């Protein structure tokens, strides 16, 4: 296999842009710590961390495969490997299958209930890229895909998925819709021209307002979770930091400039980190 194809695989997997993996990792760590009420078993943590990278990579590959006919019409994506021809469609599908196979091998080291749940993750990752052709809410499907590690984490650690796991899952879906709408605002003009659907297209001039309401809902639900679980001050400091970051993001997207919207999207890495540190502070301080 040529070096150019390997480089194309690297780009298809977005290995050069790790923020997507971080956005998937943080909620996974939230769930693992809450499920274990502290430090989760190392082997389970390692499996989930590896699984985050592998499944995010698989999702990016199948996303580019689904978008191969339209990416050439969008400024931001017209140089992607499938568009440029560096990687063929067959090679992309082979890479996707390989990554899914690796992810399945990882999950085989967990209990059978988690293995069954993992099928939901595969289904969500596979259908998400095609949703933008049929609905304005592909971001909701992405939120479910990014959040599916939460019930899996609880099942792996406790062999059950309690109500608080689904509460945390809902928080993650709302957060994902908010930040992926910011991401979709970058491509909105191109999407309108080629008929691609997204929440950014649907929300239109109300995008900032709805993103703000989603972010407010995330904060309120986090506070409710903290009260329910009896979290200490450090968690609330983390939520406060996340709230400040949300306000900063609102300022960034105020003019709807492409680069500013993308910067707001990237800033969500620190939101996830702040919440993770808040949860860790409760359990370890």
From Swiss-Prot:
Membrane-crossing segments per the record: 20-39, 92-112, 137-157, 159-179, 206-226, 228-248, 260-280
Organism in which the protein naturally occurs: Pseudoalteromonas atlantica (strain T6c / ATCC BAA-1087)
A GO BP entry: ubiquinone biosynthetic process
EC number: 2.5.1.39
Task performed by this protein: Catalyzes the prenylation of para-hydroxybenzoate (PHB) with an all-trans polyprenyl group. Mediates the second step in the final reaction sequence of ubiquinone-8 (UQ-8) biosynthesis, which is the condensation of the polyisoprenoid side chain with PHB, generating the first membrane-bound Q intermediate 3-octaprenyl-4-hydroxybenzoate.
Superkingdom assignment: Bacteria
Family affiliation: Belongs to the UbiA prenyltransferase family.
Gene name for this UniProt entry: ubiA
Keywords linked to the UniProt accession: Cell inner membrane, Cell membrane, Magnesium, Membrane, Transferase, Transmembrane, Transmembrane helix, Ubiquinone biosynthesis
Protein name stated in the entry: 4-hydroxybenzoate octaprenyltransferase
Subcellular location: Cell inner membrane
Pathway: Cofactor biosynthesis; ubiquinone biosynthesis
Catalytic reaction list: all-trans-octaprenyl diphosphate + 4-hydroxybenzoate = 4-hydroxy-3-(all-trans-octaprenyl)benzoate + diphosphate
GO cellular component: plasma membrane
Any one GO molecular function term: 4-hydroxybenzoate polyprenyltransferase activity
CDD domains: PT_UbiA_COQ2
């Amino acid at each position: 296999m040529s070096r150019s194809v390997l480089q194309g695989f690297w780009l298809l997997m977005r290995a050069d842009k790790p923020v997507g993996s971080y956005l998937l990792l943080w909620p996974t760590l939230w769930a693992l710590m809450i499920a274990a009420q502290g430090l989760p078993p190392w082997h389970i943590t390692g499996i989930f961390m590896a699984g985050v990278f592998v499944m995010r990579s698989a999702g990016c590959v199948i996303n580019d495969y689904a978008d191969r006919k339209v990416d050439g019409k969008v400024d931001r994506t017209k140089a992607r490997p499938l568009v440029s021809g560096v990687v063929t469609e067959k090679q992309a599908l082979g890479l996707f299958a390989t990554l899914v196979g690796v992810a399945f091998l990882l999950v085989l080291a967990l209990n059978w209930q988690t293995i069954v749940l993992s099928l939901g993750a595969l289904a969500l990752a596979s259908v998400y890229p095609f949703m933008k052709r049929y609905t304005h809410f592909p971001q909701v499907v992405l939120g479910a895909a990014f959040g599916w590690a939460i019930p899996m984490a609880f099942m792996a650690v406790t062999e059950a998925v309690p109500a608080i796991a689904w509460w945390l899952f809902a928080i993650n879906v709302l957060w994902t819709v908010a930040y992926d709408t910011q991401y979709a605002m970058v491509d909105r003009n191109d999407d309108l021209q080629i008929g691609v659907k997204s929440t950014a297209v649907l929300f239109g001039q109300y995008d900032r307002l709805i993103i703000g309401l989603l972010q407010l809902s995330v904060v309120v639900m986090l506070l409710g979770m903290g009260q329910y679980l009896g979290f200490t001050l450090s968690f609330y400091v983390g939520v406060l930091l996340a709230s400040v970051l949300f306000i900063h993001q609102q300022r960034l997207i105020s003019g709807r400039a492409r680069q500013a919207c993308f910067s707001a999207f990237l800033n969500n890495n620190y939101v996830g980190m702040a919440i993770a540190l808040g949860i860790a502070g409760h359990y370890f301080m």
